[in-house]
């Protein structure tokens, strides 16, 4: 006879007991079957491992496999990093790519001399990953000319054919998984898990927009004919789109907006973030290998001046931008001030993401979600948690548990599997975050920081930080890094 007698304080034990009662109350549970007089004791005493081994293989036809969970497109392939048979060969292949040198340059570059900028690891500023060859002013103009010339033909190709090319690109992305994972770690400072998720999101974008091309751009829509006439409505591309992407999702967002524009029949001139052009260069090359014409999807790497020149050109029919609110406003003013047709601006910008926790919340669940949201990817996500409001009744206990979870994080080289939090993207980002933390410290409110590892000074590491404050209104701008602000409310 075994007696199951959990002990603890009311606040810790109650939620635990409720979960256990729900589990044990299920019809299939051991406790429920043991109380059933019609179930023989011999059935209860069987070895569950032996029972499973004796079962015939069976697949429930109503439950789709992971690759088929989306009815209209194939799901991206995952990688089980908990399986040594998967992980160890992957790590060996990534080690072979450690010293590979990558280059990002304009799709159609001239023979003229241009600035060559080194791209270094954000976690080791002495280690060069590759080089970026910046786009010259006249090369920007020529790129837009090429894109404009081919756009009518690309649009006439039709949704079905464009979808086939985007799906071929998605397949090539998965074939080059090792290259993308290596670059995401070395150029963008992402942990291996974050790199896997980034690649999957990019592949999903390509397949999603391929499906949209088929759905919306293959057949015209038949409209009513009030007097017996036939009316057809068909959708077409607007022209040349400029896609300007950020460094925090250097693959997923970089490929997502061009995929949408290409699917709709537009051609694209893409300007990646100056910190992460190598990932973008590989993505564009694979799209060309998949059959997308070079003139239809062009890479224009460089600093912010390249983006300014692109958006000021009156031949640009639309801009898809992801980045800061200030830059989006500048692009909006630039588009409004130029002579030419009114251009579309699709801008995804920043903000302050908040979570409100009341006294009914389960502390363990809150801790797990808060630590993951605030500090995963070193807080460099537009969806990262910035401000946590906790009800006064549970504030001290909840904050104590969150600080415990925050202390358990491993900070360091993102190329190491054990790392939870890697670097921020560059020295400018690090300096900005450190200035914000210093200002909050001067205000006299509590600030908790993790200690950094030895060698952190070689890279752009910011210690995960928790800052207590009075209100979200105390924040004047988004602080894009591993910083969580907490507020007590009644």
Q: Where are each of the predicted segments found?
A:
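Residue-level signal for inorganic ion chemistry
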Residues: 126, 147, 162, 184, ...
């Amino acid at each position: 006879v075994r007696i199951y007698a959990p002990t603890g304080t009311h606040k810790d034990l109650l939620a635990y007991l409720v979960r256990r009662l729900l589990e044990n109350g299920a019809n299939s549970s051991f406790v429920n079957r043991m109380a059933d007089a019609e179930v023989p004791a011999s059935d209860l005493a069987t070895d569950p491992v032996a029972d499973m081994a004796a079962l015939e293989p069976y697949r429930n036809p109503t439950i789709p496999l992971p690759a088929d969970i989306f009815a209209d497109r194939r799901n991206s392939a995952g990688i089980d990093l908990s399986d040594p048979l998967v992980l160890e060969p992957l790590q060996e292949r990534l080690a072979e790519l450690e010293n590979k040198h990558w280059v990002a340059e304009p799709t159609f570059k001239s023979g003229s001399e241009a600035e060559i900028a080194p791209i270094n690891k954000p976690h080791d500023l002495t280690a060069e990953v590759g080089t970026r060859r910046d786009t010259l002013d006249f090369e920007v103009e020529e790129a837009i000319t090429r894109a404009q010339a081919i756009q009518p033909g690309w649009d006439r190709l039709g949704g079905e054919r464009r979808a086939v090319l985007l799906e071929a690109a998605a397949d090539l992305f998965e074939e080059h998984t090792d290259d993308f994972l290596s670059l995401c770690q070395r150029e963008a400072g992402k942990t291996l898990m974050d790199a896997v998720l980034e690649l999957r999101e990019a592949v999903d974008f390509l397949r999603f927009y391929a499906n949209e091309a088929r759905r919306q751009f293959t057949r015209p829509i038949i409209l009513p004919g009030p007097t017996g006439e036939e009316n057809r409505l068909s959708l077409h591309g607007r022209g040349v789109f400029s896609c300007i992407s950020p460094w925090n999702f250097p693959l997923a967002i970089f490929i997502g907006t061009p995929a949408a524009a290409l699917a709709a029949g537009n051609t694209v001139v893409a300007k990646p973030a100056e910190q992460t052009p190598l990932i973008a260069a590989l993505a564009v090359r694979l799209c060309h290998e998949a059959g997308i014409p070079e003139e239809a999807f062009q890479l224009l790497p460089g600093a912010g001046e390249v983006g300014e020149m692109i958006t000021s050109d009156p031949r640009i029919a639309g801009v898809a931008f992801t980045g800061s609110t200030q830059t989006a406003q500048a692009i909006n003013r630039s588009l409004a001030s130029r002579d030419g047709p009114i251009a579309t601006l699709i801008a995804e910008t920043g903000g302050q993401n908040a979570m409100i926790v009341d006294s009914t919340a389960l502390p363990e669940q809150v801790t797990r979600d808060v630590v993951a949201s605030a500090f995963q990817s070193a807080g460099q996500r537009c969806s990262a948690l910035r401000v946590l409001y906790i009800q006064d009744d549970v504030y001290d206990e909840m904050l104590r548990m969150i600080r415990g979870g925050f202390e358990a994080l491993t900070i360091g080289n993102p190329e190491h599997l054990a790392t939870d939090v890697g670097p921020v993207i560059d020295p400018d980002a690090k300096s900005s975050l450190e200035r914000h933390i210093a200002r909050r410290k001067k205000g006299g409110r509590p600030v908790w920081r993790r200690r950094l590892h030895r060698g952190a000074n070689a890279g752009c590491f910011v210690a995960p930080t928790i800052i207590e404050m009075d209100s979200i209104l105390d924040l004047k701008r988004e602080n894009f890094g591993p910083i969580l602000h907490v507020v007590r409310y009644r």
